[in-house]
Amino acid sequence: MEDFVRQCFNPMIVELAEKAMKEYGEDLKIETNKFAAICTHLEVCFMYSDFHFINEQGESIVVELDDPNALLKHRFEIIEGRDRTMAWTVVNSICNTTGAEKPKFLPDLYDYKENRFIEIGVTRREVHIYYLEKANKIKSENTHIHIFSFTGEEMATKADYTLDEESRARIKTRLFTIRQEMANRGLWDSFVSPKEAKKQLKKDLKSQGQCAGLPTKVSRRTSPALRILEPMWMDSNRTATLRASFLKCPKK
């Protein structure tokens, strides 16, 4: 699974996922399914934000990378992917600037057009079940919830899907592609089922000649892309980085 993740996701996303797991003391060599899930969630959050701007009239518009109007205000502020301290700093800044109610839990995005925080969910289960779990945890009408599945289903608060149909279709297509690529490599069943995941982990460790009881060292290097990304996020001038082409999964 780890090899699949490194092949199929943008290196910037992989770096952010590694950083997030290390922050919580999790070993991506062992919890490979979580590694894949975090990368998938990060990519969906980036795709949700991609190309969406607000013009001078306060209207939401979709702008391609090479469009001369690319300096317009970004519609979404990306919170997911930052370390917790920085993320809360951004949330507090947004609340102080917009008057939005501070959420109890860290959200994934802030929508400057609708003036609301957004919680993005990506599930391998039924969308309505995951939606209810999110809603019961957040318990706030001020945080908008939008759930996507790997089968093309989605569910959002009050059936308000925020994005246009084409933008949502891009996300659904990407998720379906990830599912197909996992299935082609025999990884999908273990990704969905914890029981199958344990079997896959034992198989991977055996093939690598590792012992599950031994700690595995994780690289602590920080790539140039990650060093550039964080200050760009703080300045809300991240177009070039976030618009980088996502890597396609090479065929086995």
From Swiss-Prot:
Stored InterPro entries: PA/PA-X, PA/PA-X_sf
Gene Ontology MF annotations: RNA binding
Gene Ontology biological process terms from the UniProt entry: viral RNA genome replication; viral translational frameshifting
Predominant place of localization: host cell
Compartmental location: Host cytoplasm; Host nucleus
Keywords for the protein's UniProt record, in alphabetical order: Decay of host mRNAs by virus, Eukaryotic host gene expression shutoff by virus, Host cytoplasm, Host gene expression shutoff by virus, Host mRNA suppression by virus, Host nucleus, Host-virus interaction
Site (Important for efficient shutoff activity and nuclear localization): K195, K198, K199
Site description Important for efficient shutoff activity, residues in chain: L28, L65, K202, K203, K206
Keyword Transcription regulation: no
Active site residues of this protein: E80, D108
Plastid recorded as keyword: no
Function of the molecule: Plays a major role in the shutoff of the host protein expression by cleaving mRNAs probably via an endonuclease activity. This host shutoff allows the virus to escape from the host antiviral response. Hijacks host RNA splicing machinery to selectively target host RNAs containing introns for destruction. This may explain the preferential degradation of RNAs that have undergone co- or post-transcriptional processing.
UniProt family annotation: Belongs to the influenza viruses PA-X family.
Annotated domain remarks: The probable endonuclease active site in the N-terminus and the basic amino acid cluster in the C-terminus are important for the shutoff activity. The C-terminus acts as a nuclear localization signal. The C-terminus is recruited to host protein complexes involved in nuclear Pol II RNA processing.
Protein's name in the database: Protein PA-X
Species name: Influenza A virus (strain A/Hong Kong/1/1968 H3N2)
Taxonomic lineage of the native organism: Viruses, Riboviria, Orthornavirae, Negarnaviricota, Polyploviricotina
The encoding gene: PA
